[in-house]
């Protein structure tokens, strides 16, 4: 088996674990059956989940057997957040989200061979459990004073919101998952984020009590952070989702393309499957020519392909180039163009209007007089064609797919106009 621990550490994917020597030996002797859980608290995974999803993939490629758990039971409860109670979703809603998340996780894993992945749902062993059975068989083995010390619980107890018994009990449900997976599949390792460490160790404690001969482990990845202090995975428009209907492939690609130079080396190591030599070369290029954004482009292309497929990546790259004058906008299919333009400032008008009016209305300039100056200075473009006259009005035949105009001021300032009455 591949000794994966050093690789995980080099990539910045190793925050903490139970006895590291024992874990290292188990992974070296392998294969280890391990699990990672994903709660369906929304209809899609977001980019923050990629750390876990891709680490599961990485461990499977090293020869280990993954159990990907989508929490049809725990998703109805919700892991305690630092600030407030979660909104409870109906069982029907959660069940629908379980299927959506399964569909997003499955393409990252292999379901063939000796270490074939298995998708599991903790509702299978929780739904038929009575309250009496749960309290006698699971709750009996936990001590409240220890449960109160878990970070997720302690933070809530210090807040004015407090914590409900429902969310307080979440760690018991997650602990039961580890017990069930050990008994059903021989699972001996649990993987999660470092913010889940209290829940991971709760599972270990339960196994040690009920299966004292079991040799089991827990391993946590660090949380993704940003150099500017803002939350990873968020934009002005909200979370960056893996579902293409919630975040377009174009917006997904642009999210990675716009990663801060201070963060890109860290993100590349954590998320990319490129070799050390390739990553070190990209780090060197970033240091020497940060304006080229070679590492950002490489990561954006790799992750967009993993999540959305090579075809979507090619379309997104073509759209990105065309928007900035390095390709033909007219050659983009309507769906790709519309997705790209949806991420830009845009206005809707009934008929084509003078270019200076459109530039001012969409906010590319502060006023019509500023728009005229931009035209005079040669910095105004419509569909990548330079505007040469202050009184220019786009013709209907100029509209992309019969309804779109792409406005650009200078090299980087873009906006879109949709003509509704064309």
Curated annotation (Swiss-Prot):
In the record, the note on similarity to other proteins reads: Belongs to the class-I aminoacyl-tRNA synthetase family. TyrS type 1 subfamily.
| Protein keywords | Aminoacyl-tRNA synthetase, ATP-binding, Cytoplasm, Ligase, Nucleotide-binding, Protein biosynthesis, RNA-binding
What Gene Ontology terms describe where this protein resides (cellular component)? cytosol
Q: Which GO terms describe its molecular function?
A: ATP binding; RNA binding; tyrosine-tRNA ligase activity
Give the S4 RNA-binding domain ranges: 353-419
The species is: Streptomyces coelicolor (strain ATCC BAA-471 / A3(2) / M145)
State whether keyword ATP-binding applies.
Answer: yes
UniProt subcellular location: Cytoplasm
- Under Enzyme Commission nomenclature, its number is 6.1.1.1
Where does the chain bind L-tyrosine?
35, 170, 174
| Identification of the protein by name | Tyrosine--tRNA ligase
Which residues bind ATP per the record? 234
Instruction: Outline the subunit composition.
Output: Homodimer.
**Task of the protein:** Catalyzes the attachment of tyrosine to tRNA(Tyr) in a two-step reaction: tyrosine is first activated by ATP to form Tyr-AMP and then transferred to the acceptor end of tRNA(Tyr).
Q: Does the keyword RNA-binding apply?
A: yes
Instruction: Quote the Pfam families the UniProt record gives.
Output: SYY_C-terminal, tRNA-synt_1b
